[in-house]
Design a protein with these regions (language model features):
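Flexible glycine/proline-rich, aromatic-decorated loop/lid segments
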Residues: 51
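Conserved glycine-centered short motifs in functionally critical loops
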Residues: 57-61
């Protein structure tokens, strides 16, 4: 049965490209999939700390994780700060990442819960919906909710409010209406004429999911072992992971550059001695004989010697008499070319590409020999992601807020007390 169009027509968003970048360059290990027919990566070579940015949640055998999402720009700023100063304190990191940042926005009440999660690996973040009391028409007021807490189902929330009003557990509600559209959330709770908006809103905070808490459990697999990580631990693990990815990518590119240069060195020698090469091929009984004769003969290298030495590869050696022996790979590459193409190749065409490869090989070797270069590459790639995708914080942090008391849930009324 063919897959539904919602699956076959799905496409990745632009940030996803930075989760998969260089996956084809031996940057991560692969393993068999569930039925052994395909290979799949054990981890994605993400260029930004995706576990913190997107968060994670799940339950396994004997353990659970619940990592909240964070602001991309804030997390990258903290990562860059740790790269610049590996001894940075957790308090300094919290200045960059003060609290989670939820895609649904809403208000984060206080920072103590987030701070505990960042310093100990577990904590609880209090989230409150963004709501205002507005006059919707003359002498009629309503509570207008424009942002709801993370992972709260809007339909369920509206049903709960309606049930509370119907059961008179929360008095003062005349009507609840969902006016949300593609531009955002808008839930309108119309109040009765004699209701006090602040009291009704406080009651809704207490009895509904307009106010909820997110329990942070920062459990992750670190080196294949489950570990409760602090903010410092997450960023340190990511930086170490990116070091490995960049080193493996550079080693792959070095290997490919050397493989190409090996072919080019053989072609350069062949072009320099093109008449003898063509004669050898034509006088051979079959390709196997031609390959053997190309490999056993010492070919004059002449002006190609400096380019061969420039490659800095032990597999390219010039004999003491200035000649060069072709390898089997080089001989096969020469034989794979049509004679017309071989005779048309110019020495400059080959040597120009060799010079370009030599510069790349030198740069790759420098990167692999220098941790500072690797860290510079990691920083630059993080800055590239930040420049393209960082957005302002959605969840506003209310650093100081008063605890809700019983008096906040009671309608204020004028009373007369008669004492006799």
């Amino acid at each position: 049965m063919p897959a539904a169009m919602r699956y076959t027509e799905v496409r990745m968003d632009k940030p996803a490209a930075f989760l998969l970048a260089d996956i084809d360059k031996d940057t991560v290990d692969f393993q068999d999939n569930y039925d052994g027919k395909d290979r799949e990566p054990t981890v994605l070579p993400a260029r930004f700390p995706n576990m913190l940015v997107n968060g994670a949640g799940g339950i396994a055998v004997g353990m659970a994780t619940n990592i909240p999402p964070h602001n991309l720009g804030e997390v990258i700023d903290a990562t860059l700060a740790m790269i610049d100063n590996p001894d940075i304190s957790i308090e300094e990191l919290i200045e960059f990442v003060p609290a989670p940042d939820f895609p649904t926005g809403a208000l984060i009440l206080g920072q103590s819960g987030a701070r505990k999660a960042y310093t100990e690996g577990r904590g609880s973040v209090l989230i409150r919906a963004r709501a205002t009391i507005e006059e919707i028409r003359k002498d009629r007021w309503a509570i207008v909710v424009t942002e709801i807490p993370y992972q709260v189902n809007k339909s369920t929330l509206i049903e709960t409010i309606a049930h509370l009003a119907r059961d008179k557990k929360v008095e003062g509600i005349a009507h609840v209406q969902d006016e949300s559209d593609r531009h955002g959330v808008r839930v309108v709770v119309e109040l009765k004429r004699d209701a006090t908006g602040e009291v009704v809103l406080n009651q809704l905070y207490k009895y509904t999911q307009l106010q909820t808490s997110f329990g942070c459990n920062m459990l992750a697999l670190n080196g294949g072992r489950p570990e409760v990580l602090t903010l410092h631990g997450f960023l340190s693990a990511f930086i170490g992971f990116r070091e490995e990815v960049v080193a493996r990518r550079t080693a792959y590119e070095l290997r490919k550059a050397r493989e190409r240069s090996h072919i080019l060195c053989g072609l350069a020698v062949a072009v320099t001695n093109v008449d003898e090469i063509v004669a050898t091929i034509r006088s051979s009984a079959d390709p196997a004989e031609a390959r053997e004769r190309l490999m056993t003969r010492r070919w004059p290298a002449g002006e190609i010697i400096p380019f061969i030495q420039l490659i800095d590869d032990p597999s390219h050696t010039v004999n003491d008499d200035g000649t060069y022996n072709l390898s089997e790979i080089q001989a096969r590459a020469i034989l794979d070319l049509r004679l017309q193409r071989l005779t048309a190749i110019g020495v400059k065409e080959v040597t120009d590409e060799l010079q370009d490869l030599a510069a790349k090989i030198k740069d790759y070797l420098d990167i692999l020999r220098s941790r500072a270069r690797i860290m510079e590459i990691i920083s630059n790639e993080l800055k590239e992601v930040r420049e393209q995708f960082a957005v302002p914080r959605r969840s506003e942090i209310i650093a100081h807020f008063g605890e809700m008391e019983d008096e906040d849930l009671i309608e204020r009324e004028d009373m007369v007390v008669t004492i006799t």
